[in-house]
Amino acid sequence: ANGGWPGPSISNGSIAVVPTGYTFLCPLDPDVNLDINCTNDYDALNDGLAILRGLYGLMGETLTKNTGDGPCTSQWGGQYVETRINNMFYELDVDQSGDTDAMSDGVLIMRYLFGLRGAQLVTGFTSSAEEVEAYISRLMPALGELTPECPWHKDAADCNLPQQTVTVTLSKSKIGVGGNVELIVNHSAPDDSGLAGLGLRLHYDSSLLDIGSIENSLQEGVYPFQVLDDTSNYDGDANTDKYLLTSWAELSSDAKGWLYDDFNTSTLYKVSFTAKDGYQETTLKFSASSTTYGHSFTGADINIGFSPDG
C-alpha cells in the first residue's frame, strides 16, 4: 500500500503527499538479525521456530525445545533467546503493519527461512511479497563461518548425528514419453528423537519431467508447497534445475515432537510426474532446507529408467 510507504500522507497544511517509496538510511544494529541462537546460520527450525514461539509468548526453555539453544544460549542460559527476541521485537514487524504478531510476522519469517518466496510466501496475507522479502533480507546480514562444533555445524567431522531420512516408493521404475509416475515420499528418524519438523526439497530436471498433482498426506504442521528454480544448486547436480519445496514444523513446545505419535515415521506427500518429449531416463534428488536441531539429513537418489512402452 502507498507504494511501500508505511506511514500516512505527509502534509504541509494545504497539500498532502504520499511518498512513492522509501529506503532505510540507517543500518541496523549488527545484533539485530535472525540468527537467534548464534550459530552463524539462518535456519527455520532453529531460529525461525524460536522467534515464532517467542512472539506467541512462550518464555525460557520452552522457546528452544527441539530447536537447539546454540553456543550463546548454552553459555548464558535459556533466557538468552527470549532476551534477543524482546530486544528486536519492533524490528520483527516484517509485514510493516505497525504490530509485531506471531500469526503474521512469525509465520512469514518461518516461511521465508524454509525457502518460500513470492506468492506462496504471503498466501493468506495481504502483504506484498516483494516488500516482505526485502524487509526480511535486511534482518539477514552476512555472517561469519559456521560454528565448527557439533551439533551446531551438522557437517562437522565425526559429527555422527541421528538422521532424518527420506525415502521414496515409485509406482513404476521406468516410463516413456507421455508416461506418468507417482512418488510416495516417506520420512523416518530414530523413535526417541524429539523432532521440530523438516524443510524438504525434491530436485528434478524440468526439461525431462513435468510435475503434476501434489497431495499432502501429512497435515500436521504443514506449510505451503512451492516449485522453485534451483539457482543455488542445493543438490549439487547441474542437471536438476527445479525443486519442489515442502515444509513442516511443530509449533507447540508441550508436544513431544513432530511425528512423535507415529514413532517419527510417516508418509509426507505424493507427487506425480509426466515424461516430456526427448525423455530417456532421469535422477531426482533430495536436499533439506531445514532439519531438527541435532539431526542431519539423508535422502537417497531416485532413478527413473526409460521404457518405450511408456
Q: For the regions a protein language model found, what residue spans apply to each?
A:
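Cellulosome-associated attachment modules in secreted, modular CAZymes
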Residues: 2-167, 200, 247, 309
